[in-house]
Curated annotation (Swiss-Prot):
Main location: secreted
GO molecular function: toxin activity
Protein name: Conotoxin Pu6.1
Organism this protein belongs to: Conus pulicarius (Flea-bitten cone)
Similarity comment text for this entry: Belongs to the conotoxin I3 superfamily.
Intrachain disulfide bonds: 43-57, 50-62, 56-78
Domain remarks: The presence of a 'disulfide through disulfide knot' structurally defines this protein as a knottin.
Signal peptide limits: 1-19
Propeptide positions: 20-42
Amino acid sequence: MKLVLAIVLILMLVSLSTGAEESGQEISMVGPPLYIWDPIPPCKQLDEDCGYGYSCCEDLSCQPLIEPDTMEITALVCQIESA
């Protein structure tokens, strides 16, 4: 009985790990890449969408939400840039 339970658990773990890999590949292929190195045009309004991974700052410039070097979320980047 323990052997059957162990086999079932192993099969479940294998299916979960392969499922995660497949969904990760799908996510990476859908939508634009997070980092677009072309210059981002400034936004015209504060609530305007700058595109995926960017936010519009008070000075109407588009800034990345994630710092490429440290991969940390920089939601305060607008305040840092304008200070």
